[in-house]
């Protein structure tokens, strides 16, 4: 869903950031054997790589940072931050539901901004088909991006 939503929001002129939650204690962001990977393996607390087109940062932490802490790392360079995961973060959520997996939602409807599904659900929130990226982007734009 995010891979379709990001280009639609960018087409509308918005700068989009994404934070993905990874539930496991460790992950590989860098390529094993490359300089930055070797520096991290050697014990660097933080490793950044910068080029004319990108910046990447990996920093060791003693506890999992809250979503708002992660967002502050790049919030000044984007118009909106979308997340994957962070069910407990207290932010408006868009849940994706596929009938082949389950028709039971994970989130309580009171936490939902919308549902994107391939099957009908009787909920008090907007529902979009899996392919209705324009409609979903319209909702996000109205709710979070347009200023009065």
Residue ranges, per PLM feature:
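Post-Walker A alpha-helix
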Residues: 1-2
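N-terminal phosphate/diphosphate-binding loop that engages ATP/GTP or pyrophosphate donors
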Residues: 6-62
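Short coil/turn connectors at secondary-structure junctions
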Residues: 12-15, 44-45, 76-78, 90-91, ...
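Charged helix-capping and loop-helix junction motifs
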Residues: 33, 63-67, 98-100
């Amino acid at each position: 869903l995010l891979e379709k939503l990001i280009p639609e929001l960018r087409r509308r002129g918005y700068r989009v950031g994404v934070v993905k939650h990874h539930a496991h204690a460790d992950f590989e962001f860098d390529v094993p054997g490359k300089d930055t990977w070797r520096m991290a393996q050697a014990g660097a607390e933080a490793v950044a790589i910068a080029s004319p087109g990108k910046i990447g940062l990996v920093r060791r932490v003693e506890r999992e940072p809250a979503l708002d802490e992660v967002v502050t790392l790049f919030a000044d360079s984007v118009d909106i931050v979308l997340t994957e995961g962070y069910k407990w973060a207290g932010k408006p959520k868009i849940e994706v539901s596929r009938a082949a997996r389950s028709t039971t939602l994970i989130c309580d409807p009171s936490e939902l901004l919308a549902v994107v599904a391939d099957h009908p659900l009787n909920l008090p929130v907007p529902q979009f088909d899996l392919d209705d990226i324009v409609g979903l982007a319209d909702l996000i734009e109205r709710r979070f991006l347009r200023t009065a």
